[in-house]
């Protein structure tokens, strides 16, 4: 009986400490950020379900670097890069008899290589949305391409 009473008393005591630790502390001023330098940037884009974060992130970096250099804002086509990169990956995969990976992933170097070889176009020229969808969904495309090169 004493053991149960002691256990319950300890549990209640520890719960009271937890509620005290979570007590709302209001600060009348709060923390204020001071902006020392504000840089222009392009809006964030949605890759949706495409497995092409490498393309979106690298082109975002390039677009923002162009802004930093004082050039006008431009919206470059991520899917133009992806399309040409898939062609290059397929050629290399077949040449190596399937001994290398063939998947949706990529790297920043892929982006620079494709721009050097094929160039780059604005988003309005090549959106990559040719099938009535408003977001990129590459699950089926990835499976078809893998089946094609195998």
What are these regions (language model features)?
Residues 1-24:
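Bacterial Sec-dependent N-terminal signal peptides
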Residues 24-150:
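Catalytic-core signature of thiol
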